[in-house]
């Protein structure tokens, strides 16, 4: 029987990841001069979870975590950015099998792949999805939302590049590499 649903492990990862997302979003945002745009240290964590558990978990943690954190902190949810966060997690999560973290592999090739994917994901999320959503849903001025999107792309891309890479390297180092165990004579 082919089970196409979510595993218990992934459902638990979504719940725990969303809760951690809310806490990090609340306490690790660094304001920027661009209105309503922060350096978000939660995005390396989202990239970390997406890289370990895949696209569905990445999307779900980003979407649920962002929606809850917006509602808790501001009393309302900014849906265009919530969707963009989910898409960011989803795109990064698409590469999780190629990263091969479960086998303890995160060398230069995987670091480059991870960062190319996360940069593309940031561009699509913050320069395409979020600004267009802001214009369509909230009738925001285009020049404002694209400046916010570019600022978010740069700050999130850099934070994921540095912190996300460190988190994934540390995680991979805790895994036993395939073929590293040998039977003693």
From Swiss-Prot:
The chain crosses the membrane at residues 11-31, 45-65, 72-92, 111-131, 146-166. It comes from the Bacteria. InterPro entries: ECF_substrate-spec-like (IPR009825), UPF0397 (IPR022914). GO terms for cellular component: plasma membrane. The keyword RNA-binding does not apply. It is found in: Cell membrane. It is a multi-pass membrane protein. Keywords: Cell membrane, Membrane, Transmembrane, Transmembrane helix. The keyword Membrane applies. Belongs to the UPF0397 family. HAMAP family: UPF0397. This is UPF0397 protein LBA0922.
